[in-house]
């Protein structure tokens, strides 16, 4: 393979697939990705002081990889009202969080106006303590809430932005292929609908992240297709702030008990996903985030030499990975994140949601 040309040019979806299929040049791929990372974003590794707030675990969704959801009436089910969500955001702001990530479930009771009320309450209660970025509601949540409110997606996004939504997590992407989605998340929004929500969010002035969950039933061609879709959206809107690969946690996932499902990705595939993503996106999506919650500290550190340049956040509360079988904790202090970066010879830098460095 011509790795020299791969450094300079925009590689095609076909070449992306060839990189995933290649088993002989693993370290060449890693070396190229790390070189591109250094050229594009330098040696800084960014992180955000943030808190996750899940306002309910009750959900009507049928995602086969989710072990977090509860039914109405379950002993462990909970549902926070907007005031309770706001109090959690205030607690996070008081101890230094610059971002709160707020997500819930899919329920008839949750419409766009309920989401807007959460945003307003959070902004109001935290205002005396300085600005906090609200990073909230997946594309699936936005679509479901809009339907419950009798709104179209554009109308819903306008209301959310006016109510204080700063950015959105680009989750619910999983694998952007409807055949795969019919297996792993049959009632979740279709590929075209996910594209529609995030594209309209960008056009409304709401930046989003983008994600890819791998290591379950997908094949290499699905990975290449997914990355190509994301790059095409970015060319059109420029609205993605980061790409976050999400390795499938199989231990408690209902999906794992079906015949075709793999027991997660190998460590080699984890690192290839980071590396190939960097080679494929180059500077179109500059920031690639590693997930210490899913990979653990050591593999996350290795990924920083495979194309990644962001180590995510402190989180303070992260229940979804934990429920699925994640064993790496739900909180990491700012000092621990810094030490994790320094240990691999890189420079830790605190950022906000928009990737602006906080000195």
Swiss-Prot record:
Which regions form coiled coils?
Answer: none
UniProt-listed CDD domains: Radical_SAM
Query: What superkingdom does the record give?
Result: Archaea
- Where does this protein hold [4Fe-4S] cluster? 59, 63, 66
Does the record carry Oxidoreductase as a key word? no
Q: Sorted alphabetically, which keywords does the UniProt record give? A: 4Fe-4S, Iron, Iron-sulfur, Metal-binding, S-adenosyl-L-methionine, Transferase
Its UniProt entry gives the catalysed reaction(s) as: 5-amino-6-(D-ribitylamino)uracil + L-tyrosine + S-adenosyl-L-methionine = 5-amino-5-(4-hydroxybenzyl)-6-(D-ribitylimino)-5,6-dihydrouracil + 2-iminoacetate + 5'-deoxyadenosine + L-methionine + H(+)
One GO MF term: iron ion binding
Ranges for domain Radical SAM core come to 45-282
Matching InterPro entries: Aldolase_TIM, CofH/MnqC-like_C, CofH_family, Elp3/MiaA/NifB-like_rSAM, F420, FO_synthase_su2, rSAM
Enzyme Commission number, as recorded? 2.5.1.147
The protein's matches in PROSITE patterns, at most eight in alphabetical order, are given as:
RADICAL_SAM (PS51918)
For this protein, what does the record note about how its cofactor is bound? Binds 1 [4Fe-4S] cluster. The cluster is coordinated with 3 cysteines and an exchangeable S-adenosyl-L-methionine.
Cross-referenced Pfam families: CofH_C, Radical_SAM
Q: Which cofactor does it need?
A: [4Fe-4S] cluster
Question: Which pathway is recorded for this entry?
Answer: Cofactor biosynthesis; coenzyme F0 biosynthesis
Q: What does this protein do?
A: Catalyzes the radical-mediated synthesis of 5-amino-5-(4-hydroxybenzyl)-6-(D-ribitylimino)-5,6-dihydrouracil from 5-amino-6-(D-ribitylamino)uracil and L-tyrosine.
Instruction: Give the multimer and partner information.
Output: Consists of two subunits, CofG and CofH.
Q: Which family does it belong to?
A: Belongs to the radical SAM superfamily. CofH family.
| Protein name from the UniProt record | 5-amino-6-(D-ribitylamino)uracil--L-tyrosine 4-hydroxyphenyl transferase
Q: What is the lineage of its organism?
A: Archaea, Methanobacteriati, Methanobacteriota, Methanomada group, Methanococci
Protein's gene: cofH
């Amino acid at each position: 393979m011509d790795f020299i040309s791969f450094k300079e040019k925009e590689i095609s979806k076909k070449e992306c697939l060839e990189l995933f299929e290649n088993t002989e040049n693993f370290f060449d791929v890693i070396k190229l990705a790390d070189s591109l990372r250094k050229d594009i974003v330098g040696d800084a590794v960014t992180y955000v002081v943030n808190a996750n707030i899940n306002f309910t675990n009750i959900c009507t969704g049928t995602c086969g990889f989710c072990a977090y959801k509860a039914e109405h009436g379950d002993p462990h089910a909970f549902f926070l009202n907007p005031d309770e969500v706001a109090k959690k955001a205030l607690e996070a702001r008081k101890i230094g969080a610059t971002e709160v990530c707020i997500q819930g479930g899919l329920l008839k009771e949750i419409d766009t106006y309920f989401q807007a009320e959460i945003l307003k309450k959070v902004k109001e209660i935290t205002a005396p303590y300085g600005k906090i970025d609200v990073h909230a509601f997946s594309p699936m949540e936005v679509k479901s809430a809009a339907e419950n409110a009798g709104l179209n997606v554009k109308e819903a996004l306008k209301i959310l932005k006016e109510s204080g939504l700063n950015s959105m997590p680009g989750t619910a992407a999983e694998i952007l292929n409807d055949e795969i989605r019919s297996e792993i998340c049959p009632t979740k929004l279709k590929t075209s609908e996910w594209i529609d929500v995030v594209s309209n969010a960008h056009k409304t002035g709401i930046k989003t992240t983008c994600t890819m969950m791998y290591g379950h039933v997908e094949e290499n061609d699905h990975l290449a297709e997914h990355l190509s879709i994301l790059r095409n959206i970015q060319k059109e809107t420029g609205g993605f702030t980061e790409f976050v690969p999400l390795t499938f946690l199989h231990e408690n996932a209902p999906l794992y008990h079906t015949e075709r499902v793999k027991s997660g990705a190998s460590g080699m595939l984890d690192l290839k996903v980071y590396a190939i993503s960097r080679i494929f996106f180059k500077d179109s999506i500059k920031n690639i985030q590693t997930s210490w919650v899913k990979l653990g500290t050591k593999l996350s550190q290795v990924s920083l030499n495979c194309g990644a340049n962001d180590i995510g956040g402190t989180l303070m509360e992260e229940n979804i990975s934990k429920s699925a079988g994640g064993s790496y904790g739900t909180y990491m202090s700012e000092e621990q994140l810094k030490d994790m970066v320094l240990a691999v010879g890189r420079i830790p830098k605190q950022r906000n949601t928009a990737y602006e460095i906080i000195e």
